[in-house]
Amino acid sequence: MKITILAVGSEAQYQPTFDTAYQYLKKETADLSAELSYAICRPEAAELFAALRTATGQSEAVVLLLSPEPAAVSTALRVVCSGLERTASVDAALQRQLETRAARMGLTLGYEQLPDLASFPAGAVPLPNEQGLVQGYAIPARRQLLLALPALPGELSAMFPSAV
């Protein structure tokens, strides 16, 4: 089995975070005897679309590790929806929860950022992140699996064993 991990976000800001998350996923998938590959993509639609297209052509599973920067989440959502020809829908209850959680964390998010954090592609299985703002989801497609997961290691390790 081949798994491609695409970390989405600023390499300058998040490379140590991505590296730690990759090592965690490598450990968690060791029982699968999977071959893992890993790349970092800027949150730019054309670059991510090309990387995702290549990865889906070469792997049984693709994992998008999403940095907490809003551009990473929104770009990944749009690219996944475009590539799979699906629409995104906002979970209004989750959006309210995330707004409250962000306030508790002392973060101010723009009104336009909250819907993307609470949106999922049609047909995706939500993978809740109870600790942070970046939510996960899984999309089984043909003989492949696409996962979008938070890149922050504490959030990833808290949700991965139970959700994935």
Task: Name these PLM-found stretches.
Residues 1-42:
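Glycine-rich phosphate/diphosphate-binding loop of Rossmann-like nucleotide-binding domains
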Residues 36-39, 61-66:
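Short beta-strand segments at enzyme active-site cores
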Residues 47, 51, 57, 61-63, ...:
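Proline/glycine-rich low-complexity loops and linkers
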Residues 21-23, 52, 164:
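Generic alpha-helical propensity signal that fires on short helical segments
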Residues 8-11, 67, 151:
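Short strand-loop junctions, especially beta-strand C-caps/beta-turns
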